[in-house]
Amino acid sequence: KVYGRCELAAAMKRLGLDNYRGYSLGNWVCAAKYESNFNTHATNRNTDGSTDYGILQINSRWWCNDGKTPGSRNLCHIPCSALLSSDITASVNCAKKIVSDGNGMNAWVAWRNRCKGTDVSVWTRGCRL
């Protein structure tokens, strides 16, 4: 599923991401835009043999099990396929674990490069939330 901007903002808010660990909703919507272009089915292979999955491009080396990543830790205790669902609950729950891990949203390279330090309120502007 490819989410609309406001549709995704509303879903993320409903699942408790607004100001989770101090990150406003705009940060999460911005991250999703530049990680997956709001597409829940996005997958991208990394040079280390791991794969990033879903709307927030969650990595199989650490966070989920895809059955093909050597030494996978599966810290969210989920199959990576769960992160490709049109229902973003699994992605959001795992993202909460990731952002609580010590580096905050810096865990997402696209957030660090494209969203961090910018006015992320534009990502929720005009949305009925």
Curated annotation (Swiss-Prot):
GO terms for molecular function: lysozyme activity. GO terms for cellular component: extracellular region. It catalyses: Hydrolysis of (1->4)-beta-linkages between N-acetylmuramic acid and N-acetyl-D-glucosamine residues in a peptidoglycan and between N-acetyl-D-glucosamine residues in chitodextrins. Keywords: Antimicrobial, Bacteriolytic enzyme, Disulfide bond, Glycosidase, Hydrolase, Secreted. Disulfide bonds join 6-127, 30-115, 64-80, 76-94. This is Lysozyme C. Residues 1-129 form the C-type lysozyme domain. One of its GO terms (biological process) is defense response to Gram-negative bacterium. The lineage of its organism: Eukaryota, Metazoa, Chordata, Craniata, Vertebrata. The keyword Ligase does not apply. Monomer. It is found in: Secreted. The active site is at 35, 52. Its main location: secreted. It is an enzyme of class 3 (hydrolase). InterPro entries: Glyco_hydro_22 (IPR001916), Glyco_hydro_22_CS (IPR019799), Glyco_hydro_22_lys (IPR000974), Lysozyme-like_dom_sf (IPR023346). Lysozymes have primarily a bacteriolytic function; those in tissues and body fluids are associated with the monocyte-macrophage system and enhance the activity of immunoagents. Belongs to the glycosyl hydrolase 22 family. Its EC number is 3.2.1.17. Lysozyme C is capable of both hydrolysis and transglycosylation; it also shows a slight esterase activity. It acts rapidly on both peptide-substituted and unsubstituted peptidoglycan, and slowly on chitin oligosaccharides. The keyword Flavoprotein does not apply.
